[in-house]
């Protein structure tokens, strides 16, 4: 049984990128679907779709690579964990890696990227960073 589905999903994406796989399959949850949606909107993955196998839902993620065949995801790190939650205010999540990276934040408005959370004027739990 998996205790932290977000960490599991990030690890599956990271491992698939290192092995240069075209796709990877993640366990489905609303939080993971929102997280992958942000990754797609920011250009870190090609696409994703929800599939159902044996009455279980999965998210099929198509990874994105540059012209040299290297994954566009350089680093993917879980910040807030079940044993140690990390919360930040809107002013603390304004920029990350001089705008080249993204912080994914769980807010009262849903799961948002750092620039969207800043524009909405909300802070929240820092789920992960990606660049």
Curated annotation (Swiss-Prot):
UniProt record similarity statement: Belongs to the universal ribosomal protein uS8 family.
Taxonomic classification: Bacteria, Pseudomonadati, Campylobacterota, Epsilonproteobacteria, Campylobacterales
NCBIfam families assigned to the protein according to its UniProt record, in alphabetical order: PRK00136.1 (NF001109)
Natural source organism: Campylobacter jejuni subsp. doylei (strain ATCC BAA-1458 / RM4099 / 269.97)
Keywords from the UniProt entry: Ribonucleoprotein, Ribosomal protein, RNA-binding, rRNA-binding
A GO molecular-function annotation: structural constituent of ribosome
Keyword check for rRNA-binding: yes
InterPro entries for this protein: Ribosomal_uS8, Ribosomal_uS8_CS, Ribosomal_uS8_sf
One of the GO biological process terms: translation
GO cellular component terms attached to this protein's record: ribonucleoprotein complex; ribosome
Known function: One of the primary rRNA binding proteins, it binds directly to 16S rRNA central domain where it helps coordinate assembly of the platform of the 30S subunit.
Name of the protein: Small ribosomal subunit protein uS8
Assembly mode: Part of the 30S ribosomal subunit. Contacts proteins S5 and S12.
PROSITE patterns tied to this protein: RIBOSOMAL_S8 (PS00053)
Source organism superkingdom: Bacteria
Pfam families reported for this sequence: Ribosomal_S8 (PF00410)
